[in-house]
Amino acid sequence: MFIGRERELQELNRLFESGRFEFAVIYGRRRVGKTALITQFIRDKDAIYFMGVESSSKQNLENLSKSIIEYSSGIEADTSFLSFQSALEYVFNLAETKRLILVIDEYPYVARASKSLASTLQMLIDRYRDSSKLMLILCGSSMSYMEDQVLAYKAPLYGRRSAQFKILPFNFSETCRYFPHFSPEEKALMYGIVGGTPQYLLQMNDRLSIEENIKNTFLNPNSAIYEDPSSLLKQEVREPSIYNAIITAVATGASRMAEISAKVGEDTSICSVYIKNLITLGIIRKESPYG
């Protein structure tokens, strides 16, 4: 079931219909529906889809090669390109005669394993952007990596993208579309508890009560949601213990910097750095009282 993301799909289709080289960056927290958006976008188009894995450069190159060869020949093969440059250049050349999409999902996994990948992409984009009809999409769940290593001014790929999409959780109106059988009050309660993360919303059942849904997910050690907060944080930060302490402090009522630092047991100057990172990651947000 695919819900929402009409504006993102419209913009992606606009880029696709330009017929010239385009480079889109899609990023956001895990579970917000980035891959679902891409799958929906490319479902009726010529596309090579490759998902990076947290493994070696060799393994990722082999997987990319399989995706490319399967697309171009229609058969699975065990052969591999000799380098990322030769694999990617082959795709750029393929796209000189037809419109083609190349998706590299979980790009941070691939780029961390192959340190020269960003520079290779930079070189190929500069070489082929006027002749290739390729639409390149880089997607990543590590927001810190995508912002620092792809979008930042000092990143090799800076200035070459056509568009960037920061995929956020759904708002209340979009979330309600998941729960046609809930009353307005139940929809509001569910949004307040779960938020708008699509993968979490799909695990809720609007045929059950709010209480039953909470027991089946948040309070069930076997559910997919149960361990998600800690695992997601570990993927983004180096010292999850301090971040967890800050999140716990905020969740238990500490709202001012002095209160948070007192509960955490660290100076406000230290806590402020961690809090800034949590805000950037979209885990907490700052609200100023009105009046």
What label would you give each PLM region?
Residues 1-291:
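Phosphate-binding site recognition
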